[in-house]
Structures are given as structure tokens and as C-alpha cells.
């Protein structure tokens, strides 16, 4: 997403098996998703979550409401944000020459404290990506203008780093999703499944009912968020990520129960997780599931 030097490009570079694919840089998340929907590209790669700012709602909402894509994998990368400008513009000790700061809105939000204390009078302008902000300064030779972008962007576009690591929190990471149509990758043994469950109107305890399906099967949730459905005030859906793959019997049974009871469930994919099992709690094993299923079948055979 965007020109060279984006964090999206950096995240893709960590996936050597994708090097055979021809990258098609696009300006924004909606453009990427539209290109995938139209068949102009085979895969889309977009940010979905940041450790500081939370969900990238433009991606989340598009997957929940606008497109029928399936997640192929997730990629998590560390994010360092630097302040950069034309060489000689400013130093870390003297930022007075900087009157405007350009960057992607999410990156700007991740540097609120620095901007508030170090550049309180600077005008903040949004760009469609961090790299595009850096490229614009380099190509247009904008004096007195700084960009917030990756260290790589400074090298690519001939800018000088004025201040490094200006993000509010050092443990800053962004999660990206690889998307495709009509395909689910096979189980890897370390997987996540992502779904959207639309709340039943005027039904008390609907969220509790959803959560109980996971608790009953000892399936751990790694993410739970609510989003307005766009259908009216007070109407929400729940976006859930949880451990396991749709080919696992216990996961399939959970999805079956949710579909039966909640009715409106959207499957976003089962895919390799970027990190290992963080809960420490073992889900119900396939062996235990098969054994209990065989036991139940033996009891049913007694019915005459």
C-alpha cells in the first residue's frame, strides 16, 4: 500500500515465499480491496491492527460489511517512526524551522506525545501513507516540512532523520493480513480463525451466549471487538479471532452452534497465526473429540 518505504512493504519483505509475486503498489486500503475484488490482483495485503491505536477500522469494516475475502495469513512487524525532513532543515535540539508535519493519520496518532511537546505549533497534514509523505517532501523539495515515516523512507527519498523513534510507546507493532478469494489455507498446527457475529435484535445476553460457546469448548479468544452494523443506532456486530482452524472438529462444532443460534455469522478465514499459543490452555484435542463422538454414536445405536 503506497509507494516504496511503507511499513506494508517492510512487512511483505518478511515473507520470502511471496517474493515470486509481482507487487502492485496502491494508494489506500480501499484501493487494494477494490483491486482484489475486481480481479486486478490475486492477493491483497493490508494493515488491520496496531498495538497503540487498535483496529484499522477501514480494513475491519470492509471485511465485515463490504467484501467476501478470506484471510490467508497474518504478519506482525515492529514499527519505528522517525521524524525526517530535507537535509539541514532541523536537528533534534532545534525544531523551530518545521512548520508542517505530514504523515498517515494512524502514524500521527501514534506520535501524539512527541508532537504535543516538541512541535505544538506545527500544522499537521494527513497523507495516504507514511512513505507518500516522505516522497512528497523529497520530490517537491518542501522546506520547513517534516514527515513521520519509517527509517527506510528517509534513505529512499533522500531525507535526513531529525528525530528517531518518536512513537509514544516503544513496543509498537502493526498486524497485517494477506487476503484472497475463495480459498482457505490448510491447517498448520498454529492457526487462528476470524469471524463476525451479528447481534440478534432485542435479545438480552447475546454476547454472553456467544462467549459461552467458546468457553464450553475451551477455545481461547485472542480478539473481541464490537462495531456498529450501519443498520441503525444501537445495532452492533462482534469481530472475533480465536485459536484453531475450521478443519478442527471442535472449531467446526463451535461455528455450527453459533450459526444455529445467532444465524448471522460471517467467516473471515482460518489461517496461520503470527505468534504461538499465548493462553497456555490446551483446547479439546481431536482425539478427545473423536472419542466422545464415537461414544455418542454407540449410545444412539441403542435406540430402537
Model-flagged regions — what are they?
Residues 1-304:
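Domain-level signature for soluble enzymes in the chorismate/prephenate branch of the shikimate pathway
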